[in-house]
Amino acid sequence: MSRRCEICGKGPWTGLQVSHSHRRTKTRWLPNLHKVRALVNGKVKTIKVCTRCLKAGKVQKVV
């Protein structure tokens, strides 16, 4: 399963971490994902959603 938000499609970013001596190493920054039980097309489904979509109210959570 991918580390990607199923609502907005936000996924990992890649880049370089640069130390004080300017050595560079590849790294990945992962989105803040949560597994949420939500209504999708009238059915209850567990999906991965980023915090930004949760706070914006783009997901109808099931209790």
UniProtKB/Swiss-Prot annotation:
It comes from the Bacteria. The keyword Ribosomal protein applies. GO terms for biological process: translation. HAMAP family: Ribosomal_bL28 (MF_00373). It holds the Pfam family Ribosomal_L28. This is Large ribosomal subunit protein bL28. It comes from Dictyoglomus turgidum (strain DSM 6724 / Z-1310). Gene3D superfamilies: Ribosomal protein L28/L24. GO terms for molecular function: structural constituent of ribosome.
